[in-house]
Amino acid sequence: MSNIPADLKYASTHEWVRDEGDGTFTVGISEHAQELLGDMVFVELPDVGDKVATGDDIAVAESVKAASDIYAPMTGEVVAINEDLEDAPETVNNDPYGDGWLFRIKADDSSELDNLLDANTYEASIDED
């Protein structure tokens, strides 16, 4: 069973979102997603300053099994990326909710967070898969 922290919000496409309390939101992929993908070999991240809209494919996680698009869970501007993943993409596997974060978005409208799933709803959605 995958670890699904209750303090995060989730997209149906397996991204997680953490509200940093300052108008920015950290985004990564769920433990469930990284388990499905397998060992990461490369993570292509957006550029700082990129304007993104909810649902845009803005990053790619490449594993030994497949390449998978990563989608923007909120509309806004990318304000930070996890540059450590360039040299250590396996961090996404080892610590998906911590050091394996992907990027941060300054949201245009933080109420978009309400459109995402809570941990229980996300867990129910992956149990159906």
UniProtKB/Swiss-Prot annotation:
The protein's required cofactors: (R)-lipoate
Top-level lineage group: Bacteria
Organism: Idiomarina loihiensis (strain ATCC BAA-735 / DSM 15497 / L2-TR)
Pfam families, sorted: GCV_H (PF01597)
Record-given protein name: Glycine cleavage system H protein
Subunit structure and binding partners: The glycine cleavage system is composed of four proteins: P, T, L and H.
Family as reported in the entry's similarity comment: Belongs to the GcvH family.
Gene Ontology terms describing biological process: glycine decarboxylation via glycine cleavage system
GO cellular component term, pick one: glycine cleavage complex
Note on cofactor: Binds 1 lipoyl cofactor covalently.
Occurrences of domain Lipoyl-binding (ranges): 24-106
Gene that this sequence comes from: gcvH
Chain positions with N6-lipoyllysine modification: 65
